[in-house]
Amino acid sequence: MARTLAEKVWDDHVVRKGQDGEPDLLYIDLHLVHEVTSPQAFDGLRAAGRPVRRLDLTIATEDHNTPTVDIDRPLSLLEDKTSAKQLQTLRENCAEFGVRLHPLGDAEQGIVHVVGPQLGLTQPGMTVVCGDSHTSTHGAFGSLGMGIGTSEVEHVLATQTLPLKPFKTMAITVDGTLKPGTTAKDVILAVIAEIGTGGGQGYVLEYRGEAIRNLSMEGRMTICNMSIEAGARAGMVAPDETTFAYLEGRPHAPQGADWDAAVEYWRTLRTDDDAEFDAEVVLDGSALEPFVTWGTNPGQGVPLSGSVPEPERIGDDGVRQGVERALEYMGLEGGTPMRDIAVDTVFIGSCTNSRIEDLRAAADVVRGRRKADSVRVMVVPGSAKVRLQAEAEGIDTVFKEFGADWRFAGCSMCLGMNPDQLAPGERCASTSNRNFEGRQGKGGRTHLVSPLVAAATAVRGTLSSPADLEPPVPTNV
């Protein structure tokens, strides 16, 4: 029987097939843990007298609540006592149960969905879970990456399994070659605008087509990362030579004969030619351009060349009311060209766009320039390793000379759970993944953008792409 990529990975991990509508029991290959969704899970283990089932398949890092400045301060000196408590609790739980932890200040600390791939822990054909919705990131490797809740975190810690009902499958085909300046972030924002924030509900999305195959692994991670914003449980890309080249030589990747055997298996992880998807969506990648959001959900986006929608032109009452509410919160008027929207802050970071390629791309835009006087710019690498690599390449110097704030690794301004937050009414061009009301701080207004658009926006002070910029003025004349 012909099968899709998702079905192959699923079938390879069924420990017990569900009967009479019951869920299947899946084996979990990798469990990633952080400080926010794990405390009650460890409490449950402790109360039941259970150990962690597979310490070798469990790894923890501190990311959501971590400060991105003054990281050497004791946790007791953090202003947010809830954050300090969660970080301290994770350290105590990992020490008690023997879980490997990369804490603040560790050479491998960082956002969990950056750390896993860079260590080579995420590999094709795996099942990967974490108490975080953006675990879909790991599907870029041809793995089944799923966000889970705290009770499920406890179940995996205790049994290394998870009961789940099979998902439907949807093919997202992006044909053609992307134009210069159009990135993976623009592709996924366009996909979400096309199918809506609920369009993927109940599905695993498989991204296919020439435009997807031509992406780097970091670009594929950006795409899969935001599958959840389309309502999907997971997103996947079939592994290929790009995948293998990224993984080879990483600390936890197979070595020697084991590598050869792994690659042989990984090559089988592709959708069969005659397999059928439950739904299919096709986009012309060559027609895509830089994309930005205007509203309060990731599906409320338009090309940068477009304008804010005009509610009076929308016939559906429910849709019109939703647009009106979003515009009121965002402080925007219908019909405003997107390029006329001024921002107060630019944030480059998050598990969506904080990897070395993202930082290189943004640095190339701002090199030799100065930021707009009206804008503050915050650049937060996704991991300590990414930060060190960027500094070795001189990228930190480029950002500092531009006038940006160069920070330590963490989730930072992606979410209002640490000191990096927007003030009420403050408008931000952000490379993160969610623009909900209050996501980056109470009353904060978020426009989701690519690193290229973020960098150009920081130069002009209004939503912009690199094509909008004049050549930088030479500094040696």
Curated annotation (Swiss-Prot):
Gene3D superfamilies: Aconitase, domain 3. The keyword Transport does not apply. One of its GO terms (molecular function) is 3-isopropylmalate dehydratase activity. [4Fe-4S] cluster binds at C351, C411, C414. Binds 1 [4Fe-4S] cluster per subunit. It catalyses: (2R,3S)-3-isopropylmalate = (2S)-2-isopropylmalate. Pathway: Amino-acid biosynthesis; L-leucine biosynthesis; L-leucine from 3-methyl-2-oxobutanoate: step 2/4. Its EC number is 4.2.1.33. Keywords: 4Fe-4S, Amino-acid biosynthesis, Branched-chain amino acid biosynthesis, Iron, Iron-sulfur, Leucine biosynthesis, Lyase, Metal-binding. Its cofactor is [4Fe-4S] cluster. Belongs to the aconitase/IPM isomerase family. LeuC type 1 subfamily. Heterodimer of LeuC and LeuD. Catalyzes the isomerization between 2-isopropylmalate and 3-isopropylmalate, via the formation of 2-isopropylmaleate. This is 3-isopropylmalate dehydratase large subunit. It comes from Kineococcus radiotolerans (strain ATCC BAA-149 / DSM 14245 / SRS30216). The lineage of its organism: Bacteria, Bacillati, Actinomycetota, Actinomycetes, Kineosporiales. The gene is leuC.
